Curated annotation (Swiss-Prot):
This is Piercer of microtubule wall 1 protein. Coiled coil: none annotated. Belongs to the PIERCE1 family. Keywords: Cell projection, Cilium, Cytoplasm, Cytoskeleton, Flagellum. The gene is PIERCE1. GO terms for biological process: axoneme assembly; cellular response to UV-C; cilium movement; determination of left/right symmetry; DNA damage response; establishment of left/right asymmetry; flagellated sperm motility; regulation of gene expression.
Length: 136
């Protein structure tokens, strides 16, 4: 009967113990304020598993397709204050509702000539047929 069912007599195989995921703190001295996502690079998801066509593959795709290793993770984290953003959220951005009536001076036509869309004859000295532009 044992020959009919050899698997029933065999001892169950214990599952192999998997190594715990690598942490940045296992290799480097990290800051106490380091967020968990930087200490555990295995938490990053969303990296490509399908191989792209090698003809169209760029170096950026090759670099970005790999998940980060513990050697590429930051060791120190410097958080930024969000005080400025909180003030803008409360009051909103400054809006200037004044009317701009200043005539813009042109570097091309000189400081005494204003750019206007209506002045067709004196827009630029190069276009004036009475004198060349080198006479200025």
């Amino acid at each position: 009967m044992a020959e009919e069912c050899p698997r029933a007599c065999a001892e169950p195989v214990a599952p192999k113990a998997t190594a715990p995921p690598e942490r940045t703190s296992d290799y480097y001295r990290v800051s106490a304020d380091l967020p968990g996502r930087f200490n555990n690079p295995g938490w990053f998801r969303g990296y490509r598993t399908q191989k792209a066509v090698s003809v169209y593959r760029t170096s950026n795709q090759a670099y970005g397709s790999r998940a980060p290793t513990v050697h590429e993770m930051p060791k120190v984290f410097y958080p930024n204050s969000n005080k400025f953003s909180q003030q803008l959220a409360a009051g909103g951005m400054f809006r200037n509702n004044t009317l701009n009536v200043y005539l813009e001076k042109s570097i091309v036509t000189g400081p005494d000539n204003c750019i206007t869309s209506c002045d067709r004859l004196n827009f630029h000295p190069s276009y004036n047929i009475n004198r060349p532009s080198i006479c200025d």
